[in-house]
């Protein structure tokens, strides 16, 4: 499992190529950025997981939350078989007000992923019980199908 946390696309491509060269089955996780960066990352071959698109410092719009994803990005992720991951450890470290905003953004992302049939998972996977993961997804308005897919 390789986690890449940079905003330079050429550096991301180089790290993916290096990781895939040493181990072709390596899981590549990329930390999300703004929407344009996320779109370019979702178009790169070899990416497996986009981590925490909801975590950013941009303000929400008046009528809509800025959750880091939109319907086009979700369709692109679904087409390229890329999973969207929610970083639970980062969510637990937030203060109450910021945690509420982030949870609202996660709910919006779950709805978008449900509509476009994009797989959503929790990160890190090994740390939590399967029943807890399924419960978390369903509490945040995910379908039971999404909850089952999140533990596989």
Could you describe each region identified by the protein language model?
Residues 1-27, 36-152:
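Charged catalytic cores and adjacent phosphate/nucleic-acid-binding surfaces used
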Residues 30:
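Active-site histidine-anchored catalytic micro-motif
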């Amino acid at each position: 499992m390789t986690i890449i946390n940079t905003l330079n696309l050429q550096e991301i491509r180089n790290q993916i190529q290096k990781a895939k060269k040493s181990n072709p089955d390596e899981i590549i996780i990329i930390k999300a950025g703004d929407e344009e960066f996320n779109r370019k990352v979702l178009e790169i071959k070899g990416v497996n997981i986009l981590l925490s698109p909801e975590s950013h410092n941009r303000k929400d719009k008046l009528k809509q939350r800025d959750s880091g994803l939109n319907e086009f990005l979700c369709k692109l992720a679904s087409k390229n078989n890329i999973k969207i991951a929610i970083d639970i450890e980062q969510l637990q470290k937030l203060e109450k007000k910021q945690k509420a905003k982030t949870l609202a953004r996660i709910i919006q992302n779950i709805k978008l992923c449900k509509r476009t049939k994009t797989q959503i998972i929790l990160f890190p996977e090994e740390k939590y019980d399967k029943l807890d993961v399924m419960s978390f997804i369903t509490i945040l308005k995910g379908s039971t199908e999404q909850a089952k897919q999140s533990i596989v």
